[in-house]
Structures are given as C-alpha cells and as structure tokens.
Amino acid sequence: MSKSSFYCFGKSVRGREHRLSGLPNQDALRIYIGKDNNPVIIALADGHGSPVHFRSEVGSKMAVDTAVDILSSVRETDIKVPNKISKYPTLITREWNSRVLLDHKNKKFSSDELGALYDEVKNESFVDYVRLDPKIGYGTTLIVVASYGDSMLYLQIGDGDILVVDDTGNVRKPLRDDVQFSRYQTKSLCTHGASDDFRIAVEKNNGANPVLVLASTDGYSNSFKSYQEFFKVGIAYLDLIRILGCDFLEDILEDLLCKTSSQGSGDDITVGLACSSDLASDHGFIFP
C-alpha cells in the first residue's frame, strides 16, 4: 500500500473533578487531514492544570496547533531521513515557546493569577521565577500520531498513551513510557531542554499493521486498574468498529469518555483515533 489512508476522529471531555471545581478542560485535540489523506495528523495535549501552570489550557491548545502547523508541511520523503526526524522536537518546542511568550506579552500575568500562585506555593521567590520564565504558566504535554504514505510517525513528550493495534488484535505501545518521579509529575514543553525529553519513532505501515491507532491523555489510562486492562480498550474498539463501524464509535465516544472519567480518574480525557480506511469501510453485523 503506497498511500496509506486513515479515517480519523476524536473527542475531548471535561473530567468530573474539573466540573466540580469549575476548572475548564485543560486538554486539547486537533486533527489534520491533508490532500489525498497525506498526511493525516492527530495531535493532543494535556495542560497540567495545577496552580503553577495556570494558563495550561492556553498552552495545550498552542501545543496541538504548533505540532500540526509544523508537521503538516513535512514531506513524505522527509519521514524516511533520520536527521530530519530528529529535528522535529526542537522545531516544535522552539515554536511553542515563541507562541506562549507572545501570548504573555499581549496579556501579562494578572495580579489575581500571581496571587493564586503565591497562595498555593507560599514562596515569593518561586512567584518571581514564574514571572521571569512565563512559559511555566502554560505547561503541557503533547502527543502526535501522523501518517505519511506508508510511514507512521509517533512523537510524545510527557505522559499519556499511544496504542497500536494490528489486524490480529495485537496491542502494543510504539514508544517507551515516560520516566516520571511520580504519577503526578511528568515531562513538559515548559521545562528547559524540553526537546531532549521527546520520544519519537517512525514505523512502516503495511496496511495490516496498524489497522487502528489510539492516542489518549493520561486521564484515560488512569481510569483503569492496570495497563493490562487499559490495553483491552484497543481490542474492544477494533471489535466494535468491525461490527458497527467508525461512525457508531464516533457517535458514542463522548458519552463513553465522560462515563469513564466519572467512574475512574475524574480527570479530563482526550482520545484521538486513526482507523485504516479498509477497516472503516469494511464492517457489518457478525453473527455466530
């Protein structure tokens, strides 16, 4: 298959805890479909949402926009050149920094924002540090899944998950897990040297592998008792699409994620799905 084609969709829902506290959804999602479905890009981000990162809702939106704006101009042949691939984290980080600093220049941190930060940390020196390095206020993760012809690009900084499902139902992660100090600390675009914290991989797409790719913020996997249970989502989605089709899953996805958050992590959940066009168009009821 020289030109891969995917049907892409996704949803982002506000978590139970954020609904109760009045905090907006800190996640962001953007899906880009290029000419002739080449490239296809899913970008999602999870703004940290803590009092320290009080503009992370803005930061996450800028992260997905930055990733799509940069990667949508990448040529299919570029994906096969390691030296070019290795530059994407630097390009994305540098552009995200520029955008958040411009946002801060146009809208300086208010006394209310800095006051709330001080109330949380009780440390004037740290407040001064954030004032001098404003990108901290915009902290966010970033996950990208992109298809360029017969190549798949996976790129990530921070927590969250990418699951790849082949036509036999085998589920795996194309990237190593983020090394974190704890469940509540993760790598971020806002930290110094962020470009070095990206994990990145390019894999061949042969049509049968993958047939489905799921990208999600950590609010999804944290809603399950174990990663083994979370991996079953990939198989369940594949089976559901084969029986009822992508349109059905797309229609119920928002309600499904809201229920998962309410019964699980309580966090915002964002999911992006890339389903091979052959799988998306080949479904029907299956009877024993």
Enumerate the language-model features and the residues they cover.
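Short hydrophobic beta-strand that contains or immediately precedes a catalytic carboxylate
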Residues: 42-46, 155-157, 214-216
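Short helix/loop capping segments that flank catalytic or ligand/cofactor-binding pockets
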Residues: 52-53, 153, 164-166, 223-225, ...
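Helix-loop-helix
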Residues: 65-108, 232-255
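N-terminal entry segment of metal-dependent catalytic domains or homologous docking segments
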Residues: 1-72, 160, 189-203, 263-272
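PP2C/PPM family metal-dependent serine/threonine protein phosphatase catalytic domain
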Residues: 9-23, 114-135, 139, 164-208, ...
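Short acidic-glycine loop/turn motifs at beta-strand connectors
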Residues: 33-36, 147-150, 158, 165-170, ...
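C-terminal catalytic subdomain
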Residues: 184-288
